[in-house]
C-alpha cells in the first residue's frame, strides 16, 4: 500500500475537524435514520477499539419551547440512543436546569433541558493509528 500526503500525515486534520465522534443528532430532523444509525454504529466501534484516544462527553441541550416541543426532542434523543445499538455511552435524559449542575453556566431563562452523550477523539492520533493499521 502507498500513502501520499501533501504535508505531514494528518497535517490539516485539527483545523477541519470538530474532534467529535458522533452520530449526527441534527440529521434526525431530516429523517436520515440510516446515516445516523451507521454513524452511531461506527462511533461504537471507535469507542471499543480505541478507548485510549476517545473521551466520552455529555452535552446539555437547553429546551427552547418556541423552537420545538419537548416531546419532539425526547423522541429524537430516544431514537439517537437506539439507532446505532448504543452500548458504551449512557442514554439521554431530561433535566431541570434551574436546580442542577447541568444548568451551570447557562442563562437563567432555561428551566429544562436534555443531556445526551457523544465522544471526543484525538483526531490526529486516530489518523496515524488508522494509517499504521492499514
Model regions: which residues?
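Alpha-helix N-cap/helix-start motif
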Residues: 13-14, 72, 123
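Dinucleotide-binding Rossmann-like beta1-alpha1 core, especially the glycine-rich loop
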Residues: 19-103
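Helical element adjacent to the flavin cofactor pocket in flavoenzyme catalytic cores
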Residues: 114-134
